[in-house]
């Protein structure tokens, strides 16, 4: 029973739940970016370049023979994937930059130090009195 309770404690920690939410949102965001690049950015870019469909760009290394498919380097899909990556990396960079800015603003306004308790005040006074007595005794 101890292992189950340990797993439960681990699974409901804030960091684990936050990580799971981040992974799910990241996967959904990746799909959105892929659609954005493939369906919105690449077609106009292909027209500007001269009517090129990037998904069809490939180099055939060996033609298909019978049931054996062709060996192809699909560099157009690779270009599209690189553009996906650049957009995702930029979005993550902007998100991290915004979070860091918020953290810096919090750090600029530190909270006031807590006021000492009556016991701490009394101990401080006793310490100061002892220091002054010791200084008076030294030649």
From Swiss-Prot:
It is a multi-pass membrane protein. PROSITE patterns: MSCL (PS01327). One of its GO terms (cellular component) is plasma membrane. SUPFAM superfamilies: Gated mechanosensitive channel. It comes from the Bacteria. GO terms for molecular function: mechanosensitive monoatomic ion channel activity. Pfam families: MscL. Keywords: Cell inner membrane, Cell membrane, Ion channel, Ion transport, Membrane, Transmembrane, Transmembrane helix, Transport. It is found in: Cell inner membrane. The chain crosses the membrane at residues 9-29, 79-99. Belongs to the MscL family. Channel that opens in response to stretch forces in the membrane lipid bilayer. May participate in the regulation of osmotic pressure changes within the cell. Homopentamer. This is Large-conductance mechanosensitive channel. It comes from Pseudomonas putida (strain W619). The lineage of its organism: Bacteria, Pseudomonadati, Pseudomonadota, Gammaproteobacteria, Pseudomonadales.
């Amino acid at each position: 029973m101890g292992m189950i309770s340990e797993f439960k404690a681990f699974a409901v920690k804030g960091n684990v739940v936050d990580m799971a939410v981040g992974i799910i949102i990241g996967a959904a965001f990746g799909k959105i970016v892929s659609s954005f690049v493939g369906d919105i950015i690449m077609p106009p870019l292909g027209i500007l370049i001269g009517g090129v469909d990037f998904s069809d760009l490939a180099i055939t290394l060996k033609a298909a023979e019978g049931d054996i498919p062709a060996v192809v380097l699909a560099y157009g899909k690779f270009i599209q994937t690189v553009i996906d990556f650049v957009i995702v990396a930029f979005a993550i960079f902007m998100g991290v930059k915004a979070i860091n800015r918020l953290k810096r603003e919090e750090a600029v306004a530190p909270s006031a130090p807590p006021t000492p308790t009556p016991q701490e005040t009394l101990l401080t006074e006793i310490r100061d009195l002892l220091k002054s007595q010791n200084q008076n005794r030294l030649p």
